[in-house]
Amino acid sequence: MNFKYIVAVSILIASAYARSEENDIQSLSQRDVLEEESLREIRGIGGALLSAAKVGLKGLAKGLAEHFANGKRTAEEREVMKRLEAAMRDLDSFEHPEEASEKETRGFNQEEKEKRIIGPVLGLVGSALGGLLKKIG
């Protein structure tokens, strides 16, 4: 008789353990889903900020290009213009989607372009604005 009780208690313990394992797996799955949703939201916000920055930089670059096109330019200003034009071409390439076969590498390529473009563009815009302010002042 004691053997039956031992077996019954063992089965109860095993089923309780199995249920706790299932609950742990479900809670981990729910956490993973929530983390993925959070990452998607963060990427969406980052993409929106990047789009706004691109539009602002493109407008600023076009304004600077028009300003520099109207007057005589020094060698330094010509170099700044060449860099701005290159940056504009790179920014335009962000807006044109690649073929479906290249979608997997697009995210990596876009991150590399962003790293390569945003730093120098901000430096160029700063130096161009500084030069413009020196001329005005």
Swiss-Prot record:
This is Bombinin-like peptides 1. It is found in: Secreted. The modification Isoleucine amide is found at I136. Expressed by the skin glands. It comes from Bombina variegata (Yellow-bellied toad). Residues 1-18 form the signal peptide. Residues 91-112 are annotated as: Disordered. Transmembrane segments: none annotated. The keyword Secreted applies. The modification D-allo-isoleucine is found at I118. Pfam families: Bombinin. InterPro entries: Bombinin (IPR007962). GO terms for biological process: defense response to bacterium; killing of cells of another organism. Belongs to the bombinin family. GO terms for cellular component: extracellular region. Coiled coil: none annotated. Keywords: Amidation, Amphibian defense peptide, Antibiotic, Antimicrobial, Cleavage on pair of basic residues, Cytolysis, D-amino acid, Hemolysis, Secreted, Signal. Disulfide bonds: none annotated. Has antimicrobial activity, but no hemolytic activity. Preliminary evidence indicates that this peptide does not lyse and thus kill the bacteria by its antimicrobial activity. The modification Asparagine amide is found at N70.
